[in-house]
A protein has these predicted regions:
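Histidine-acidic metal/acid-base catalytic patches
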Residues: 21, 28-29, 86-108, 112-194
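Active-site acidic/histidine proton-transfer and metal-coordination neighborhood
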Residues: 1-105, 115
Length: 194
């Protein structure tokens, strides 16, 4: 369900409350949510942000009490998710500043961020306090991580580690055709083992 649609909020709160309780009971630290799409409801980005803030404030005390993070995922709208609202970090920062919770932030998907914003390491430094989880994926193509892509993954791993991040990094990619999936994952783990 999309957080930008106010008509969804009651049902989302009910479903998400159960998920928060289950996550806390099973030591699952993060729950991923999505902002929604511009085409849904025909609203402006500002109205969508306001609606997301309203909903996130409704669940704020529950996640703080239960010790679970809500992570709104950043996705690119240029290649993979046309019309997705949270496609630039600054939009998400505005939402998170207004929600004002140490338990509500965003999933910084580095693949998506590189496509729509770039400037990955500076963005991580500037907005790390809102980043509750990270995803990777080779740019371009969302293939496995390697040293012949746009991003220096080892450097990014060091940036994240230097900020004392203790959470998970999800390697969310597809191995290139003909690649060994296990070897690709081992390579990603090696890159991020800093």
């Amino acid at each position: 369900m999309e957080l930008n649609i106010k008509e969804n909020h009651d049902e989302m709160e009910k479903l998400l409350s159960a998920t928060i309780d289950d996550s806390a009971a099973n030591n699952v630290p993060n729950i991923i949510v999505f902002s929604g799409y511009r085409s849904t409801g025909g609203m402006s980005d500002q109205e969508a942000a306001d609606n997301c803030v309203t909903f996130l404030k409704r669940i704020k005390s529950r996640v703080e009490d239960k010790g679970v993070n809500i992570c709104m995922e950043l996705l690119n709208s240029k290649v993979n998710h046309r019309g997705y609202i949270f496609d630039h970090v600054e939009w998400g920062v505005d939402v998170m500043e207004r929600v004002d919770s140490t338990r509500i932030g965003f999933l910084y998907d580095i693949y998506h961020a590189q496509i729509d914003d770039g400037d990955v390491s500076r963005t991580i430094h500037n907005h790390f306090k809102f980043m509750k989880h990270f995803h990777t994926g080779g740019v371009p193509g969302r293939w496995e991580l390697s040293d012949d892509q746009e991003l220096n993954w080892r450097y990014i791993a060091k940036v994240i580690a230097d900020l004392n991040y203790e959470g998970f990094v999800g390697h969310e990619y597809s191995p290139m055709p003909g690649s060994d999936p296990a070897a690709c994952l081992k390579q990603a783990f090696g890159i991020f083992n800093v």
